[in-house]
């Protein structure tokens, strides 16, 4: 049966995902940045209370995936911490300035991760040649690759995703970016073994007093009064589609 991974940005989101049928969680902070390394407090609380597999993201900042030496050193320290806390896997990715997988740094990441399953995230979609990148990641021992098929969303990139799947069984190709209940069946019919979804919704902040003339973000248009949450019903609907597909 296809595996459903849900991207979660808090302890509450992780609990919601687990209760509604998620098979695995990608744990992140900072949804507006596309996911950054969670805090130690969040890591510890999720490790204590969530029983399904959780893979924290290791990403020190938003933007591109070419990191300074200092940023990369911090990533290795975060990997060691995630390993010490007992997580079964992690999610990360590093590129060269030319859009290739940085194999030298990936070797160091794999050494630091040890027995943990490593997912190479959507830095893959920024690679100049996805098929060369996939071969390099297979050689590195990466467990899976999260990809939208190098398009803005996975529905647009499904043909490339299918080509990547045809390259072999490892790494596993996990489709993500815009995967929802209304298009999930297309991925299952295409033979995708793992899917990744945020299943998220923006909820209004409970704050009654609001200083509308002030923002904590450099983006003065940023909405300070909405919060990202995993929608349990969306997770359950997607899991139901997967179960019914398996029963065919």
UniProtKB/Swiss-Prot annotation:
Record Gene3D superfamilies: Copper homeostasis (CutC) domain
A GO term for molecular function: copper ion binding
SUPFAM superfamilies from the UniProt entry: CutC-like
Domain of life of the native organism: Bacteria
Record localization: Cytoplasm
GO cellular component, as recorded: cytoplasm
Keywords from the UniProt entry: Cytoplasm
InterPro entries linked to this entry: CutC-like, CutC-like_dom_sf
Protein family: Belongs to the CutC family.
Oligomer and partners: Homodimer.
Descriptive protein name: PF03932 family protein CutC
Organism in which the protein naturally occurs: Salmonella paratyphi B (strain ATCC BAA-1250 / SPB7)
